[in-house]
Amino acid sequence: MNISENTMQILKNYGTINPNFIARKGNTIMTVSEAKNILSSSNIEEQFEQDMGIYDLNEFLNVLSLVDQPKLDMEEKWVTISDQTGRSKIKYFFTDPEMLTSPTEKMIQNAGNMESFEISFTLDNDTLNKVKRAASALGHTSMKVESKDTDGVVLMVFDTENPTSNTFSIDVPGQGQGEGQYVINISNLKIVPGDYDVKISNKNISNFIHKEKPIQYWIALEK
Protein backbone atom coordinates (compact mmCIF):
# COMPACT_ATOMS: atom_id res chain seq x y z
CA MET A 1 0.00 0.00 0.00
CA ASN A 2 1.25 3.48 -0.89
CA ILE A 3 0.27 6.64 0.99
CA SER A 4 -0.95 9.56 -1.13
CA GLU A 5 0.07 13.18 -0.53
CA ASN A 6 -3.50 14.02 0.51
CA THR A 7 -3.49 11.30 3.15
CA MET A 8 -0.05 12.36 4.36
CA GLN A 9 -1.36 15.90 4.83
CA ILE A 10 -4.28 14.61 6.90
CA LEU A 11 -2.05 12.35 8.99
CA LYS A 12 0.32 15.25 9.71
CA ASN A 13 -2.68 17.29 10.80
CA TYR A 14 -3.91 14.45 13.02
CA GLY A 15 -0.48 14.30 14.61
CA THR A 16 -1.01 17.86 15.90
CA ILE A 17 -4.32 16.83 17.49
CA ASN A 18 -3.16 13.61 19.17
CA PRO A 19 0.06 11.59 18.69
CA ASN A 20 -1.91 8.40 19.42
CA PHE A 21 -3.51 7.01 16.27
CA ILE A 22 -5.39 3.92 15.20
CA ALA A 23 -5.97 3.25 11.51
CA ARG A 24 -9.02 1.01 11.43
CA LYS A 25 -9.59 -1.52 8.68
CA GLY A 26 -11.13 0.29 5.70
CA ASN A 27 -10.75 3.80 4.31
CA THR A 28 -12.00 5.97 7.17
CA ILE A 29 -9.52 7.46 9.64
CA MET A 30 -10.41 9.32 12.84
CA THR A 31 -8.76 11.09 15.73
CA VAL A 32 -9.70 12.76 19.00
CA SER A 33 -7.62 15.00 21.24
CA GLU A 34 -6.64 13.87 24.74
CA ALA A 35 -9.03 16.47 26.17
CA LYS A 36 -11.83 15.16 23.90
CA ASN A 37 -12.46 18.71 22.65
CA ILE A 38 -11.37 18.09 19.02
CA LEU A 39 -12.80 15.21 17.00
CA SER A 40 -12.22 14.50 13.31
CA SER A 41 -13.13 11.95 10.66
CA SER A 42 -11.91 11.62 7.09
CA ASN A 43 -12.35 9.29 4.15
CA ILE A 44 -9.06 8.56 2.39
CA GLU A 45 -8.00 7.03 -0.92
CA GLU A 46 -6.24 4.05 0.65
CA GLN A 47 -7.77 0.92 2.14
CA PHE A 48 -6.14 -0.34 5.34
CA GLU A 49 -6.15 -4.13 5.41
CA GLN A 50 -6.29 -4.32 9.21
CA ASP A 51 -6.25 -2.19 12.36
CA MET A 52 -2.93 -0.46 12.97
CA GLY A 53 -2.14 1.14 16.33
CA ILE A 54 0.53 3.87 16.37
CA TYR A 55 1.73 5.30 19.69
CA ASP A 56 3.49 8.33 18.20
CA LEU A 57 2.05 9.33 14.83
CA ASN A 58 4.61 12.10 14.33
CA GLU A 59 7.46 9.63 14.80
CA PHE A 60 5.78 7.24 12.35
CA LEU A 61 5.51 10.00 9.75
CA ASN A 62 9.18 10.87 10.24
CA VAL A 63 10.00 7.21 9.66
CA LEU A 64 8.00 7.24 6.43
CA SER A 65 10.08 10.20 5.26
CA LEU A 66 13.25 8.10 5.49
CA VAL A 67 12.42 6.41 2.19
CA ASP A 68 11.22 7.74 -1.15
CA GLN A 69 7.63 6.84 -2.07
CA PRO A 70 7.17 4.55 0.96
CA LYS A 71 5.34 1.28 0.44
CA LEU A 72 3.58 -0.35 3.41
CA ASP A 73 3.21 -4.11 3.81
CA MET A 74 1.09 -5.07 6.83
CA GLU A 75 1.76 -7.99 9.13
CA GLU A 76 -0.13 -8.93 12.29
CA LYS A 77 2.11 -7.02 14.70
CA TRP A 78 4.16 -4.73 12.49
CA VAL A 79 4.37 -2.99 9.15
CA THR A 80 7.31 -3.19 6.77
CA ILE A 81 8.06 0.16 5.15
CA SER A 82 10.17 0.03 2.00
CA ASP A 83 11.13 2.22 -0.92
CA GLN A 84 10.03 1.42 -4.46
CA THR A 85 13.25 -0.49 -5.21
CA GLY A 86 12.97 -2.64 -2.09
CA ARG A 87 16.55 -1.83 -1.05
CA SER A 88 15.62 0.14 2.08
CA LYS A 89 13.29 -1.45 4.63
CA ILE A 90 12.01 -0.45 8.06
CA LYS A 91 10.20 -2.79 10.45
CA TYR A 92 7.82 -0.71 12.58
CA PHE A 93 5.88 -2.41 15.38
CA PHE A 94 2.27 -1.60 16.20
CA THR A 95 0.99 -0.57 19.64
CA ASP A 96 -1.88 -2.35 21.37
CA PRO A 97 -5.00 -0.26 20.56
CA GLU A 98 -6.14 -0.66 24.18
CA MET A 99 -3.24 1.57 25.22
CA LEU A 100 -4.15 4.39 22.84
CA THR A 101 -6.58 7.30 22.96
CA SER A 102 -8.79 7.11 19.90
CA PRO A 103 -12.39 7.92 18.95
CA THR A 104 -15.06 5.28 18.61
CA GLU A 105 -17.51 5.07 15.74
CA LYS A 106 -20.26 5.91 18.24
CA MET A 107 -18.53 9.20 19.07
CA ILE A 108 -18.49 10.09 15.37
CA GLN A 109 -22.13 9.05 14.95
CA ASN A 110 -23.24 11.09 17.96
CA ALA A 111 -21.36 14.15 16.71
CA GLY A 112 -22.82 13.67 13.23
CA ASN A 113 -26.34 13.59 14.64
CA MET A 114 -26.30 17.31 15.44
CA GLU A 115 -29.62 18.45 14.00
CA SER A 116 -30.10 22.05 15.08
CA PHE A 117 -27.61 24.87 14.52
CA GLU A 118 -27.75 28.44 15.79
CA ILE A 119 -25.18 29.89 13.37
CA SER A 120 -23.78 28.76 10.02
CA PHE A 121 -21.07 30.52 8.02
CA THR A 122 -18.30 30.08 5.47
CA LEU A 123 -14.71 30.23 6.70
CA ASP A 124 -12.17 30.46 3.89
CA ASN A 125 -8.49 29.76 4.36
CA ASP A 126 -7.46 33.41 4.00
CA THR A 127 -9.88 34.49 6.74
CA LEU A 128 -8.67 31.78 9.11
CA ASN A 129 -5.07 32.86 8.56
CA LYS A 130 -6.02 36.47 9.32
CA VAL A 131 -7.72 35.37 12.54
CA LYS A 132 -4.65 33.41 13.64
CA ARG A 133 -2.29 36.27 12.78
CA ALA A 134 -4.48 38.71 14.70
CA ALA A 135 -4.53 36.40 17.71
CA SER A 136 -0.74 36.20 17.64
CA ALA A 137 -0.33 39.97 17.24
CA LEU A 138 -2.81 40.84 20.00
CA GLY A 139 -1.85 38.01 22.33
CA HIS A 140 -5.39 36.63 22.52
CA THR A 141 -6.58 33.03 22.40
CA SER A 142 -10.34 33.35 21.83
CA MET A 143 -12.52 33.87 18.77
CA LYS A 144 -16.11 34.99 19.19
CA VAL A 145 -18.64 33.93 16.55
CA GLU A 146 -21.55 36.37 16.61
CA SER A 147 -24.72 36.74 14.58
CA LYS A 148 -26.53 40.05 14.88
CA ASP A 149 -29.53 38.92 12.86
CA THR A 150 -30.38 36.41 10.13
CA ASP A 151 -27.95 37.97 7.63
CA GLY A 152 -24.24 38.11 8.36
CA VAL A 153 -21.78 36.74 10.91
CA VAL A 154 -18.85 38.44 12.62
CA LEU A 155 -15.70 36.73 13.88
CA MET A 156 -13.88 38.60 16.65
CA VAL A 157 -10.50 37.91 18.24
CA PHE A 158 -10.66 39.15 21.82
CA ASP A 159 -9.68 38.62 25.45
CA THR A 160 -12.43 36.89 27.42
CA GLU A 161 -11.05 38.27 30.69
CA ASN A 162 -10.67 41.92 29.67
CA PRO A 163 -13.62 43.76 28.08
CA THR A 164 -11.41 46.78 27.28
CA SER A 165 -8.75 44.77 25.42
CA ASN A 166 -7.89 45.41 21.77
CA THR A 167 -9.90 43.34 19.31
CA PHE A 168 -9.87 42.24 15.67
CA SER A 169 -13.11 41.53 13.82
CA ILE A 170 -13.96 40.35 10.32
CA ASP A 171 -17.29 39.81 8.58
CA VAL A 172 -17.97 36.44 6.95
CA PRO A 173 -20.93 35.22 4.88
CA GLY A 174 -23.42 33.35 7.00
CA GLN A 175 -26.58 33.53 9.02
CA GLY A 176 -27.92 32.87 12.49
CA GLN A 177 -31.19 32.13 14.20
CA GLY A 178 -31.46 35.67 15.53
CA GLU A 179 -28.84 37.17 17.82
CA GLY A 180 -26.28 34.89 19.43
CA GLN A 181 -22.61 34.52 20.22
CA TYR A 182 -20.27 31.62 20.89
CA VAL A 183 -16.57 31.36 21.70
CA ILE A 184 -13.94 29.03 20.24
CA ASN A 185 -10.41 28.61 21.58
CA ILE A 186 -8.22 29.49 18.59
CA SER A 187 -5.60 26.92 19.62
CA ASN A 188 -8.22 24.24 18.94
CA LEU A 189 -8.52 25.24 15.27
CA LYS A 190 -6.13 22.48 14.23
CA ILE A 191 -7.62 21.89 10.81
CA VAL A 192 -6.29 21.07 7.35
CA PRO A 193 -5.87 24.26 5.27
CA GLY A 194 -8.78 25.09 3.00
CA ASP A 195 -12.28 26.54 2.94
CA TYR A 196 -14.94 25.29 5.35
CA ASP A 197 -18.67 25.31 5.95
CA VAL A 198 -19.04 25.87 9.68
CA LYS A 199 -22.05 25.26 11.91
CA ILE A 200 -22.41 26.25 15.55
CA SER A 201 -24.74 24.36 17.89
CA ASN A 202 -26.14 25.51 21.21
CA LYS A 203 -24.91 22.15 22.53
CA ASN A 204 -21.45 23.76 22.86
CA ILE A 205 -20.02 22.17 19.73
CA SER A 206 -19.03 23.39 16.27
CA ASN A 207 -18.76 21.43 13.01
CA PHE A 208 -16.16 22.31 10.35
CA ILE A 209 -16.73 20.59 6.98
CA HIS A 210 -14.03 20.98 4.32
CA LYS A 211 -15.44 22.19 1.02
CA GLU A 212 -13.12 20.12 -1.19
CA LYS A 213 -11.78 17.23 0.87
CA PRO A 214 -13.78 14.48 2.64
CA ILE A 215 -12.75 15.59 6.11
CA GLN A 216 -14.63 17.26 8.94
CA TYR A 217 -14.00 18.32 12.52
CA TRP A 218 -16.11 18.79 15.62
CA ILE A 219 -14.60 21.35 17.98
CA ALA A 220 -15.94 22.09 21.45
CA LEU A 221 -16.96 25.64 22.31
CA GLU A 222 -15.77 27.51 25.38
CA LYS A 223 -18.34 27.66 28.17
Mark where each language-model region is.
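DNA polymerase processivity clamps
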Residues: 1-96, 114-223
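Long, charge-dense
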Residues: 95-115
